[in-house]
Amino acid sequence: SGSCTTKTCWTTLPKFREIGYILKEKYSEAVHVEAVRATRLRQPTFLKIKKPRTYRKPMVTDLVYIERSPNYCEEDSSTGSVGTQGRLCNRTSHHGDGCDLMCCGRGYNTHQYTKVWQCNCKF
């Protein structure tokens, strides 16, 4: 009897969380640029870095932005941001739901609640 071995290879996407970490890092290192019109005819508009000359030129994989992001901590009806004031947060979390991050350094109030409900338990 003969034996047969096959090898199958395929490409998979990285885990969603890994992509999120990479995007977050790129977002925090994004470069502020401004659009500048070329002075000569038939030359395209180009982007100029709005940092000191010591700053390196962005690579093709870097993120750049033209306008600064709004302050999502404060309510802003023009952007539709409701802000973070009054939202529930997790005091012990170091993620997006954590009080230190969500409350934007403004501090927060803690409340302790006791909830009583009928559980239909049998002993």
Swiss-Prot record:
Residues 33-61 are annotated as: Disordered linker. One of its GO terms (molecular function) is cytokine activity. GO terms for cellular component: extracellular space. Pfam families: wnt. One of its GO terms (biological process) is canonical Wnt signaling pathway. Disulfide bonds join 89-104. Glycans are attached at residue 90. The keyword Ligase does not apply. SMART domains: WNT1. InterPro entries: Wnt, Wnt_C. Palmitoleoylation is required for efficient binding to frizzled receptors. Depalmitoleoylation leads to Wnt signaling pathway inhibition. The keyword Amino-acid biosynthesis does not apply. Keywords: Developmental protein, Disulfide bond, Extracellular matrix, Glycoprotein, Lipoprotein, Secreted, Wnt signaling pathway. Transmembrane segments: none annotated. It is found in: Secreted, Extracellular space, Extracellular matrix; Secreted. Belongs to the Wnt family. Ligand for members of the frizzled family of seven transmembrane receptors that functions in the canonical Wnt/beta-catenin signaling pathway. Required for normal fusion of the chorion and the allantois during placenta development. Required for central nervous system (CNS) angiogenesis and blood-brain barrier regulation. This is Protein Wnt-7b.
